[in-house]
């Protein structure tokens, strides 16, 4: 997870988008300086391009694929899984969309802790099969998005 950013370290405009749990997967409404970003990125864990970021608070399980752009994420509310080459990120994104996280059902304030993630068993087919599954669902998501856009266009006629 990224290092905590305090409100006084952000501004409404600036160099580096800062995503909080409410803006994660959307448009940033806060920014941090390039200097702070460079310092924190060099000192603290930071995702790699292609990593799947996951919301651990609020709308638990919302995922975003990290594009590699210069942007920063709210401390323990947005996390990612560092893993080896036995797990494909596109497959992991599909898995995150269907997993039932143990230990969070019924709690008043929903929160996904490291133990919830680390103790979750992931059935892992071969990497080649994971890639096929991940690619299939990514293409399916793209087709659904295109059809939704077409529906919006048709409704606006």
Specify the residue positions occupied by each region the protein language model found.
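Feature detects amphipathic, helix-rich regulatory segments
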Residues: 1-157
């Amino acid at each position: 997870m990224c290092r905590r950013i305090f409100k006084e370290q952000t501004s409404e405009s600036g160099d580096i988008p800062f995503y909080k749990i409410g803006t994660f997967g959307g448009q940033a409404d806060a920014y941090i300086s390039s200097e702070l970003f460079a310092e924190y990125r060099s000192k603290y864990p930071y995702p790699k391009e292609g990593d799947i970021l996951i919301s651990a608070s609020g709308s638990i399980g919302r995922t975003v694929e990290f594009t590699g752009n210069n942007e920063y994420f709210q401390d323990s509310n947005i996390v990612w899984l560092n893993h080896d080459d036995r797990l494909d990120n596109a497959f992991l994104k599909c898995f995150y969309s269907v997993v039932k996280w143990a230990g969070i059902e019924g709690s008043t304030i929903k929160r996904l802790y490291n133990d919830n993630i680390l103790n979750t068993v992931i059935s892992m087919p071969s990497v080649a099969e994971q890639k096929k599954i991940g690619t299939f669902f990514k293409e399916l998501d793209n087709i659904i998005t295109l059809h939704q856009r077409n529906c919006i266009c048709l409704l606006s006629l």
